[in-house]
UniProtKB/Swiss-Prot annotation:
The chain crosses the membrane at residues 3-23, 42-62. GO terms for cellular component: plasma membrane. The lineage of its organism: Bacteria, Bacillati, Bacillota, Bacilli, Bacillales. The gene is yhzF. This is Uncharacterized membrane protein YhzF. It is a multi-pass membrane protein. It is found in: Cell membrane. Keywords: Cell membrane, Membrane, Transmembrane, Transmembrane helix.
């Protein structure tokens, strides 16, 4: 069970760092890649972070 939580924590960390990276990239004035693509990537990473945090929460709640 603890290995599962460690794996989920690593996945959460990867998604969170990706979200921070893309949000930082979104604030820069570059024209490529398009802002909508960066916004979509940031949204996917943020959603992945929230989903894995919910999995960790409910796993700890049920265990």
């Amino acid at each position: 069970m603890s290995v599962f939580l460690i794996v989920l924590s690593c996945i959460t960390l990867a998604f969170a760092s990706g979200a921070v990276y893309y949000i930082k990239l979104l604030s820069q004035a570059a024209s490529y890649p398009p802002k909508r693509v960066i916004r979509q990537k940031a949204l996917v990473c943020s959603t992945g972070t929230a989903f894995t945090l919910c999995l960790i929460f409910f796993t700890k709640l049920l265990a």
